[in-house]
């Protein structure tokens, strides 16, 4: 601000008859500008506040330093920028506080405006805390209470409201000091009395001179020194570092010594590692690395790992940004984990038992003597004594379905389980007894037996046809036997000729040739047997077609007849029962394959069969639908049946 210009209202300008058209000349404006620059540079003196007498900063802009027209002033001033005294809130001084323990004087006569009940000034009858009197003080003028003391209305600031020492009188601490001094004097008197009676020996130094108990009294007020006043002999406790103490970074002055971090004042590695003759120092200080694994470090690391696992599982939790949330989640997780573990353990114990073994008996019972005698051999088996009771299964026992005499799983061969009584590998299949075992063993050895030796001939096949088939088989066997005999005669002739030519023993090539010849014969028999089986099946299909055609014709012919008990009706009923039995056999076979695929854990029930014995139709249907393991097409037929019923 270069110069002061009085800012007057229009009314004052009119009274003073100031001409508004008068303006400063160019030279005056230039002079004021130069003066302003000099004041800012410090070469010219600054303007002085007419009210406070202090210099006005020349760098203050004019719109701030110039007082408005409604604030009159005699010269340059900054009073308009400072807070107004009449608007300032007067705060309570530090020595002002509520008076405590005040008692007013009681009057002898009732005064106007006092409480009608107790007679004290300061409150009315409806606000009186005294017990309502039967005869109040206004009527009796007796036993008038003391007047109420009106506490001052203190205006406290932010810090004054939160000052814990507000209203404290330091002079009250003198009473505490005096109490301690009286206790100390009483202690000295009691100690002198005990020393005179000989109950306590006087304290002495190492040289035998009497020890001065007040030798550290002057140092008791020093920082870091505390005197134990309660013990019989005073002990000075110094928590400051002594001068002979060596800093961490001075233990090892080698160039490759462990690094000392001055910011955290830590040396993680051991400075005496590999230094001979420093075993005692290494025992006192071996580095600060142990701090990294002490305290809450392990818990913090576990929380961090839990946060990673929770985030991977879809629950976002940050160990640094949300520590409270992470701790709550971890507590809830540990609680649910322990609850689930206990529930699972309880379910297993309820299902299988053995809860009495989970609790450890007392040591007196474990180490006590018993009367039960048990003797073991070198292999750990019980020779004498009570053996362990076999654990009973939760499955039903002694139930053999489908005419079996053993359970499924009692026989094992080539990676498959089966029945021991008949060597069958299909579960819920009908038992074939010893014939099934013979067929299975012959198939395993390479020799085969016909189906007629294993299964009985169905009733639908006529006896004459069976006889014809047997005669054909016998004729084929005779032909094969003749061929074999011819081959044997030829071989004998060759052997005789070879013997006559060379009496040397047969070579390995001849033995291999004999084995190949046997294999060719076995293969030939197998092919012939397969051909006979195919011919039988073809004939069987033709007979079925012929019977179906006859049955249809009989149905057409019997529509006009009224007799329901004819022979065709009985045959149709038997055929219907046969079809139902065939469907049932196929359904049971499909269910058995499904159960075998699902396994013991997958299926719902362990027993899904009926205990009733099968009738003749069901047995016949089982024989018709069953595929023997010796059949070369057995694998193909089983796979085809499985594909058909798994769609």
From Swiss-Prot:
Residues 21-41, 465-479, 513-533, 588-606 have a biased composition (Basic and acidic residues). GO terms for cellular component: cytoplasm; spliceosomal complex. It is found in: Nucleus. GO terms for molecular function: enzyme binding; pre-mRNA 3'-splice site binding; zinc ion binding. A zinc finger (CCHC-type) spans 113-130. Residues 1-19 have a biased composition (Polar residues). Residues 480-491 have a biased composition (Acidic residues). Residues 534-555 have a biased composition (Basic residues). Residues 1-44, 193-212, 465-620 are annotated as: Disordered. Pfam families: Slu7, zf-CCHC. The keyword S-adenosyl-L-methionine does not apply. Keywords: Metal-binding, mRNA processing, mRNA splicing, Nucleus, Spliceosome, Zinc, Zinc-finger. Participates in the second catalytic step of pre-mRNA splicing, when the free hydroxyl group of exon I attacks the 3'-splice site to generate spliced mRNA and the excised lariat intron. Belongs to the SLU7 family. This is Pre-mRNA-splicing factor SLU7. The gene is sluh-7.
């Amino acid at each position: 601000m270069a110069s002061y210009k009085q800012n007057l209202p229009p009314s004052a300008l009119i009274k003073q008859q100031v001409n508004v058209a008068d303006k400063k000349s160019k030279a005056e404006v230039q002079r004021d500008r130069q003066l302003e620059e000099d004041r800012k540079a410090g070469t010219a003196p600054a303007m002085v506040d007419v009210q406070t007498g202090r210099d006005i900063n020349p760098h203050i802009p004019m719109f701030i330093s110039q007082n408005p027209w409604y604030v009159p002033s005699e010269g340059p001033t900054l009073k308009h920028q400072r807070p107004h005294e009449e608007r300032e809130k007067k705060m309570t001084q530090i020595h002002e506080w509520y008076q405590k323990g005040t008692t007013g004087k009681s009057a002898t006569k009732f005064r106007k405006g006092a409480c009608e009940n107790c007679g004290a000034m300061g409150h009315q009858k409806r606000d009186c805390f005294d017990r309502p009197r039967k005869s109040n003080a206004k009527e009796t003028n007796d036993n008038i209470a003391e007047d109420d003391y009106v506490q001052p209305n203190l205006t406290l600031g932010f810090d004054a409201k939160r000052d814990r020492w507000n209203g404290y009188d330091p002079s009250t601490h003198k009473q505490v000091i005096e109490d301690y001094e009286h206790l100390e004097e009483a202690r000295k008197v009691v100690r002198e009395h005990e020393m005179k009676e000989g109950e306590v020996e006087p304290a002495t130094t190492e040289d035998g001179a009497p020890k001065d108990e007040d030798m550290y009294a002057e140092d008791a007020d020093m920082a870091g020194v505390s005197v134990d006043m309660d013990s019989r002999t005073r002990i000075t406790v110094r928590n400051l570092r002594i001068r002979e103490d060596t800093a961490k970074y001075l233990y090892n002055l080698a160039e490759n010594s462990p690094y000392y971090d001055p910011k955290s004042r830590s040396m993680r590695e051991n400075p005496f590692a590999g230094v001979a003759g420093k075993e005692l120092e290494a025992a006192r200080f071996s580095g600060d690395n142990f701090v990294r694994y002490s305290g809450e470090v392990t818990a913090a690391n576990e929380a961090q790992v839990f946060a990673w696992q929770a985030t991977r599982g879809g629950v976002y939790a940050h160990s640094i940004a949300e520590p409270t949330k992470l701790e709550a989640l971890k507590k809830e997780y540990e609680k649910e984990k322990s609850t689930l573990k206990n529930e699972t353990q309880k379910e297993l114990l309820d299902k299988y038992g053995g809860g009495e073994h989970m609790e450890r008996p007392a040591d007196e019972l474990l180490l006590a003597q018993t009367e039960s005698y048990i003797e073991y051999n070198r292999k750990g088996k019980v020779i004498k004594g009570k053996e362990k009771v076999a654990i009973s299964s939760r499955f039903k026992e002694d139930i053999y379905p489908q005419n079996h005499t053993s359970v499924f799983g009692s026989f094992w061969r080539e990676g498959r389980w089966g029945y021991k009584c008949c060597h069958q590998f299909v579960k819920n299949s009908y038992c074939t007894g010893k014939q099934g075992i013979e067929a299975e063993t012959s198939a395993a050895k390479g020799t085969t037996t016909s189906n007629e030796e294993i299964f009985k001939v169905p009733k639908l096949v006529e006896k004459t046809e069976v006889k014809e088939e047997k005669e054909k088989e016998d004729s084929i066997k005779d032909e094969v036997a003749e061929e074999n005999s011819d081959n044997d005669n030829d071989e004998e002739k060759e052997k005789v000729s070879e013997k006559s030519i060379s009496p040397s023993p047969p070579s390995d090539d001849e033995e291999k040739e004999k084995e190949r010849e046997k294999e060719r014969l076995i293969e030939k028999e197998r092919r012939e047997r397969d051909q006979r089986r195919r011919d039988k099946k073809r004939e069987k299909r033709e007979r079925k077609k012929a019977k179906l055609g006859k049955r249809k014709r009989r149905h057409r012919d019997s529509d006009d007849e009224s007799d329901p008990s004819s022979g065709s009706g009985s045959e149709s009923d038997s055929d219907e029962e046969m079809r139902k039995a065939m469907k049932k056999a196929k359904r049971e076979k499909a269910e058995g394959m499904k159960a075998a695929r699902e396994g013991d854990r997958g299926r719902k029930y362990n027993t899904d069969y009926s205990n009733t014995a099968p009738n003749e139709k069901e047995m016949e249907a089982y024989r018709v639908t069953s595929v023997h393991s010796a059949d070369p097409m057995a694998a193909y037929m089983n796979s085809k049946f499985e594909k058909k019923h798994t769609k």
